[in-house]
Amino acid sequence: MDCLTDLRSTEGKVDQAGKTLILLVVWWGFGTTAEGHPLQQLWELPCDCSGGYVSPDLPITPTPSIAVASPLPDLRVWLQGSWGWGGGFRQQWECVFKPKIIPSVQEQPGPCECLTIATQMHSTCYEKAQECTLLGKTYFTAILQKTKLGSYEDGPNKLLQASCTGIWETSMLGPRCPCVCLDGGGPTDRFGRICAEGLEEIIRHSYPSVQYHPLALPRPRGVDLDPQTSDILEATHQVLNATNPQLAENCWLCMTLGTQSPQPSRRMAMSLSMEIAVLASLSGATHRVNRCQLLCREADNRTGIPVGYVHFTNCTSIQESLTRRVIYEILRDYVLHRVMYLCVEQHAYTALPNKWIGLCILASIVPDMSIIPGEEPIPLPSIEYTAGRHKRAVQFIPLLVGLGITGATLAGGTGLGVSVHTYHKLSNQLIEDVQALSGTINDLQDQIDSLAEVVLQNRRGLDLLTAEQGGICLALQEKCCFYANKSGIVRDKIRKLQEDLLARKRALYDNPLWNGLNGFLPYLLPSLGPLFGLILFLTLGPCIRKTLTRIIHDKIQGSKNPRISPAVQATPNRDGYPRSMV
């Protein structure tokens, strides 16, 4: 027993000595920790810059996720890691100076501190930019944080994206980029948008939109023709006076609006002014040329210029244009006679080259003109002439009246059928609803009668219980109430209402309008309107068609008018070839 007690006391002393030794080792070996700042003991304070100061020119890629706020306004601190010589990884605080703020001088940007001017700079390469002045010009200065290569968007036809060169370098950028590029919404894009809006505003002020007055003021209707049109009309009148003087004394010369279609004819002899006016009217496709004797020129030079082959007429004689004599004749024909060479339908040549390939015909060009005698009305009337045509307007009155009657009949017949059918459906629905309502009232009356029986039964029971006191009324010392049963009156009215509903329903079904044609008449009524309209259309349709055909025929006949048809007569020239004269 004593040995066991000594052993336990010895174990307690050993445990106490071990705990004391552990506390001493902890106290002497590890030291104290900074309360609340365990990272400061491991990495030191950020402002101490244990990793040193990093130059902005070095290619450093900081990690923003571990950046800390520096109490100094001109420093930016980053936690960077590096591998040691023994293979361990060590982290230290490195500091980079922030860009200095350029103060403004007299409400103008301050002077620039750097002299590197970049031609382009993308907005994703820097965080902030500020304005500065250099040699009287305003620039944007910023510290680049990454590089970027310029790239195309969807091929070379799009604008080029701006690039950036130099990490952590202070660069300047002008407000306008010398190259056509985009900087991702930066200063260049903003100034370009402002310049475009300014140019659009200048254009709007320089060329204001025309605002027409709603009132059309009268003005004199004089001759307001361009010189070319006047020359064409004068030349045409000269030709008409030479061919038909009687018609030229009193006539109308009308030209079509829009693109003119000149008419070719063979070598018309006319004055120089006439030829100039005729040649000025060449602007469209030519017409077919059907003449008695037509002289064509053909050349088949393999090294020549193709001018085309005429295919809208038949050549009576073809001459090969290969010799110098023929070339001289071509030039002489144009100089003396002012003829044209038609090789295709849409082109006319005043002269042909030395070497050419094709088949051409000699012709002159006359304008597409309509000639109307002076005593006849103009087919294309003016506004005043249209307002006075009352006789033709009368022809449309029967047509309009017939269309109005037909439309009214169709609408009335269809509406009548639909309204009658709808009335029948509404009457049936109303009868059914009233019958359902009367049945509901009858059920309520049955409930009231059963409740009255229960109340009367309770009254008799209370009178028996209070018989010694003279009844329930004397016991309560109140006026006695009695039940007046009027359920018979309500039931009589409900029965009469149901009988009236049955009579109305029977009378509705006994109507011949609904029982006609074995019950099909209600379904045929909505189609009576369209059926009547079809019959009316078949009756009046031939008359309307005949009237419209006659009116269209009169319009076509009235628009026909005589055209210029020059008379062509083949006469031999001094070279032996036939020549046409007007």
Curated annotation (Swiss-Prot):
Disulfide bonds: C251-C254, C251-C481, C473-C480
Record field: compositional bias (Polar residues): 562-572
Motif CX6CC per record, residues: 473-481
GO aspect biological process, one term: symbiont entry into host cell
Residues in compartment: Cytoplasmic: 541-582
Extracellular-facing ranges: 36-519
Positions of short motif CXXC: 251-254
Site (Cleavage): R392, A393
Signal peptide annotation: 1-35
Domain comment as written in the entry: The 17 amino acids long immunosuppressive region is present in many retroviral envelope proteins. Synthetic peptides derived from this relatively conserved sequence inhibit immune function in vitro and in vivo.
Entry protein name: Envelope glycoprotein
Chain's gene name: env
